[in-house]
Curated annotation (Swiss-Prot):
DNA-binding residue intervals: 853-872
Gene Ontology biological process: positive regulation of carbohydrate metabolic process; positive regulation of DNA-templated transcription
Subunit-level organization: Monomer in solution. Oligomerizes to an active state in the presence of the positive effectors ATP and maltotriose.
Domain HTH luxR-type: 829-894
Organism taxonomic ancestry: Bacteria, Pseudomonadati, Pseudomonadota, Gammaproteobacteria, Enterobacterales
Protein family: Belongs to the MalT family.
MF-aspect GO terms: ATP binding; DNA binding; DNA-binding transcription factor activity
Protein name per UniProt: HTH-type transcriptional regulator MalT
Activity regulation field: Activated by ATP and maltotriose, which are both required for DNA binding.
Amino acid sequence: MLIPSKLSRPVRLDHTVVRERLLAKLSGANNFRLLLVTSPAGYGKTTLVSQWAAGKNELGWYSLDEGDNQQERFASYLIAAIQQATGGHCSTSEAMAQKRQYASLTSLFAQLFIELAQWHRPLYLVIDDYHLITNPVIHDAMRFFLRHQPENFTLVVLSRNLPQLGIANLRVRDQLLEIGSQQLAFNHQEAKQFFDRRLSSPIEAAESSRMCDDVAGWATALQLIALSARQNHTSAHHSARRLAGINASHLSDYLVDEVLDNVDVSTRHFLLKSAILRSMNDALIVRVTGEENGQMRLEEIERQGLFLQRMDDTGEWFSYHPLFGSFLRQRCQWELAAELPEIHRAAAESWMEQGFPSEAIHHALAAGDAQMLRDILLNHAWGLFNHSELALLEESLKALPWESLLENPRLVLLQAWLMQSQHRYSEVNTLLARAEQEIKGVMDGTLHAEFNALRAQVAINDGNPEEAERLAKLALDELPLAWFYSRIVATSVHGEVLHCKGNLSQSLSLMQQTEQMARHHDVWHYALWSLIQQSEIQFAQGFLQAAWETQERAFQLIKEQHLEQLPMHEFLVRIRAQLLWAWARLDEAEASARSGIAVLSTFQPQQQLQCLTLLVQCSLARGDLDNARSQLNRLEKLLGNGRYHCDWISNADKVRVIYWQLTGDKKSAANWLRHTPKPAFANNHFLQGQWRNIARAQILLGEFEPAEIVLEELNENARSLRLMSDLNRNLLLLNQLYWQSGRKNDAQRVLLDALQLANRTGFISHFVIEGEAMAQQLRQLIQLNTLPEMEQHRAQRILRYINQHHRHKFAHFDEGFVERLLNHPDVPELIRTSPLTQREWQVLGLIYSGYSNEQIAGELAVAATTIKTHIRNLYQKLGVAHRQDAVQHAQQLLKMMGYGV
């Protein structure tokens, strides 16, 4: 829950001086990206801006305290303030902030700006007390905020010092409106107005001016002069002389003498006790101070001018002026040291009653009350964990003695989950083993099962599927149905292990169970994970359309639950890119891979390896080897600077080996083959992929026999495990082996099998990537006119893509080739005496490549009737009557020129 007072603009009091000269300057604030108000404490920053904000409905106000250095807390309040200003316009950003479903503050702000792009009226956000922010991550995010905020948005920052927000750059570009302490200082006229409103008897203008000069227009000093004069019935000028030259760092003695020592004991104790509260209301005051009517007491303190300010329009929430509050808390530690723990305990109890466990934890920690802290955590820790209050939980658990954790083992489990969320896998097992050894008495079976569920998750994350499976099964055998979270974890892990083992049907069933449980209990990250796993399994089974539909459900879940900035979102867009690539939708595949990189923009560059691999794949499928080489340079640098799962390495090696194949780089392939480890098994898609990489390198090096052994074994495993997509890939590589080793009949046989299987998988790019060797075979099959209709259609599509992307459209019939052909001693006399025009040679090349008349017209951007004329002319010059004759004639010319066709 968010504390309402932190989002309420301070109430404008009747007796405050309206700063007309400053308000006039602020009237043009909407023309600037940043309004910055800086000064030491007590110069009236908040009062001035609250006067300026009066009447502005589309303005959000966020009052900071020390706890706002937590990124998640800062984000939640900032988005909530903007929601107040816009009347709930940014609902997606709000949901992401509330559920902590964003990768970083900058990515959350990027989503916010997408929503604000549809907001066209002036909009303001005030952040008060920004000097309390010391977290560099928040500073970086706010610099991003200022760079990218909409033109109609003005950020207003109040701070005691110059914030780290790139101020100089804004100043140079005239996008900064500044007000400092010299401008905030009261002038003579304002000081006279102030005293006239605060003192019972007026003073002369000259005396008022002298007092203003004595304290350099410092508003807090003027307020203290008026307060002291009222309390001590002395002249205001006497107080002014005492304050002359004083500053905030020397104010403590004055406040003791002139404020605390001049109130009755009851009020003094009230001030000291209530000061421990960062914000306060009636219920908190009653519990902390023991006063019977907290609201009435707060209003009385406010009337006395004791630096108490209302934080909302209803008058329910109050806070002390920061300067006075800090002074009071320091005095409280000195004067009420013995009572202080009990005061904090009372505050914690009241915050708990009002439903603010994080504030309660703050006071329990301050009280040093381990038992109270333990009780709060036992009741609320998992809720805080699910809302990503990880830093607060870690601080709290560190404050508890180990013995207390052992007496409450679920807190040990919580600490272990915190470690798991930070990828500290070895520490998780060490902690759980120590706890099991030291817990007194027989350990509860259910708790032991929860330990095992967590251990199973750690094991699979750490690349140990056998141990993960053992632990997941143990957990599921012992966990009651009501322990849904651990059951979801264990079921998910078991399904993932079966996926790794190639048991796809059972794995799919378990992942579907995981999804159902996770949706039922609103555990959305596991629901998303299970959908991603289901899609991968369906892809491996060769059911790419089913995989597409599962991905659509996952994208819908992301949209509904605002999961766009979870790292898992990158996993989803990546497998979508893989599917699009398989279907030769290369532009969409590339866009999807780039969106995955964008999701991971705030993570280590190594996390982008998989998406970068897909970008290389897209370049290779297009035949753009220059771009592929540039991307491979980046990829190989990442490979040399990180440790990766074997799946990641297999995919990265795949594009490297294909690049070496397309460029004939046998040296690199041989070096890689010498050093790459050979997996012990081939029972899942990534192990199959790495063995396929090995076979491709062997084929490139002419090592046909060992490559054939590898591929035959891969096919046997793929058929037995129903890894149909891998079987399709294996057949295509086996086809290349047979073709290059001169076994043309075997090559044709497996190519026909691959085309038939592609009716199920929909593969296109896997054929295209093999280039001209594949094109030659497909032309022959098409010419035979014996392919079934679906295979014939697919072969024609593949051939079109090869011609389009691998630059074979005119490769054999360009100007240089034609010139060499005409000078060849064996060129037919008919061609020498009636040479084709360059356009007719292009048309002949496209006919040879399998293009229809309509496709040739589209390729050359001319009318179909024009193409018919070109075809009629070239038929006449070649002395042929039919298309098939023209294809055979072109083939003979290519053979004559030394091209293997």
